[in-house]
């Protein structure tokens, strides 16, 4: 809860600054920061673009459907059922897909590595597929594990250049 409140306060602070143009508000992060970027964009409609590299905290309910959840894998299964049903119910509200489903207007770039075993691609896709914004793109990197990958930077730089070009 505190993490999400801090996101909102940080965005409120940025929007209160006299040097903010009143139009452009981009959130960007990787892994847990990617989860925070999706949450920030979902919680604040003033966000104009979101970049999430291998976002964490996606698809917490995956084990209930026999899939692997993304980090941190809150739901433990026991005998085909959640070991703690209260945890299974609660984490749905802290799932990046829950926040992603609220991103209506922001331009979105999501990146995933196909050999990432921390934030598995299926969990990233669960969040990406929840985004209703018409301007969304996912880029797959078949060779990428979790963490920094040089091509992430190239794709991100191109996306940002398109967002920040004069006249946009």
Kindly label every feature range from the protein language model:
Residues 117-123:
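Conserved alpha/beta-hydrolase "acid-adjacent" motif
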